[in-house]
Structures are given as C-alpha cells and as structure tokens.
Amino acid sequence: MMRLWRRLTALVLALLLTLSVGAAGTTGFSDVPESHWAAQSIQRCAQYGLLQGVGGGKFGLGRTMTRAAYATALCRLMGWELVTPEKGSFTDNQDTAKWYYSAIETAYAHGALTGESRQCRPNDAITREEMAKMTVRALGLAVLSGTAADDCPFSDVSVAQGYVALAYRMGIIKGVSAYNFEPKKEATREQAAAVLLRTYDRLHAAIKVTET
C-alpha cells in the first residue's frame, strides 16, 4: 500500500509542473452568509475563476451541481485549453452552441469523462461518487484506482471504490461518517466548491514543496 501512495504522490507532482490557475478579484454572493461552512471555499473558487454564480449576485447555495458545470470547473482548475470538435463525442452533446459543449469535449479528451456510455448526461446532477471519479481521472490517476479499491474505508461504496479511496486519501473529499460516503447522493454547488478548493490547495501545496 505504501508503494501505491508513493506512486500517487509522484504522479501528482509530475502533473503539477504544467498546472496553472489564474486569479480574479474577490467575489461575494448575497446568498452565502459569512458563517456558512463553505463560504471560504465558495469565495476562493470564485476568486480563482473555478466557479461562477447563477446570476443576480447569487451563488446558488443548496442547488445541485450539474455534471456539465463540474466538468467546466475541472477544465478551469487543470488549465486545459478548450477543444471544439465539429462532432460531439456523446449522443447528448452534439449542439456546439451549448455553453458546456467545449468543456464536455475537453474533459473527455483528457480522460476526466469516459466513453463507457454514449451519453454524458450534462444536465444531470453529479453524484458524490461521480465527483470523486471525475476529479481523480482529471488528475491522471485512474491507473491507480484498481489497486486503491481495497483501501476504500466506506462500506456503502461498491462501484467506484478505487476513485473514492484515492480522493479520500488525498484529502479531496470526505465521508458523511467514518464508514459511510453516500455515493449516490447528489452533490450541491457548495459541496463541489469544497472539493474543487481542496484539490486546488493540495496541488499548489505540492508545487511549493517541489520548488523549495
């Protein structure tokens, strides 16, 4: 197991050499009180340009995060240049005029989204296990998911054990209790912000280590 985590660290550090995220000005939302548990994550995600509000000065607190919105945020986090092919890779991503078209195609090109199904379900709410899987795949760590599956601490995860285990061990995502993850539960926008911010912080903390 120690060899697995050494490989994980090495792969992440290698990835970081090309990672960059631009920062924007500080942003506040009228529906996010300063006392909210995710207030700092939301504010910093907006500041770094990872997430935007839903309009009218609101973040959309409590709303579910769509798969398209999360894929878009990952593209921004990873600094991927958007691609816009003439034909989409999924049956439900064929309209090039859709705001998420290029992000879906870019996430697919980088392996964050898979072609296992002919549909990407862009407007569906992303589940907690899908969020873990998409994030780990965006980091280029899918190769470790098979080995990591036996290290998953949550008894209610059966489909994406390796991805959840990796995301958990990296400190990117948390369980709802010591042994429960609620993998099929839909993630809210603030929960997605927390995962994105933790990913950002872990990556940039590792960058600082390699530079010293």
Model-predicted segments: where are they?
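Hydrophobic alpha-helical
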Residues: A165
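Feature responds to low-complexity, polar/acidic, surface-exposed segments characteristic
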Residues: M2-A39, Q52-Y101, A109-A132, R137-G162, ...
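GST-like fold's C-terminal all-alpha helical module
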Residues: Y168-M170
